[in-house]
């Protein structure tokens, strides 16, 4: 499954990128798509081979977490 996470700061994005890769994801740092708004403009796009609970994907560093389906983004959760 493919996911996209947005962040409040670039530091949070970098930290999450390392975290999610340690969990076994194929991940990359990218600019946030225009369809979505983000505080820092950076996002992490990642694919998980297995399933992780939402609590492990939506850490405190994440602003919003989306499931990616082509050009569509389904909001799975957010931190305020």
What are these regions (language model features)?
Residues 1, 10, 21, 26-44:
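Amphipathic, hydrophobic secondary-structure cores in small proteins
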Residues 10, 14, 74-77:
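NTP/phosphate- and nucleic-acid-binding module
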Residues 4-6:
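A short beta-strand micro-motif
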């Amino acid at each position: 499954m493919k996911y996209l996470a947005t962040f409040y700061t670039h530091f949070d994005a970098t930290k999450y990128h390392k975290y999610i890769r340690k969990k076994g994801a194929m991940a990359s740092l990218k600019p946030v798509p225009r369809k979505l708004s983000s505080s820092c403009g950076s996002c992490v796009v990642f694919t998980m081979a297995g399933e992780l609970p939402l609590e492990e994907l939506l850490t405190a560093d994440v602003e919003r977490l989306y499931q990616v389906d082509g050009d569509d983004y389904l909001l799975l959760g957010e931190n305020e």
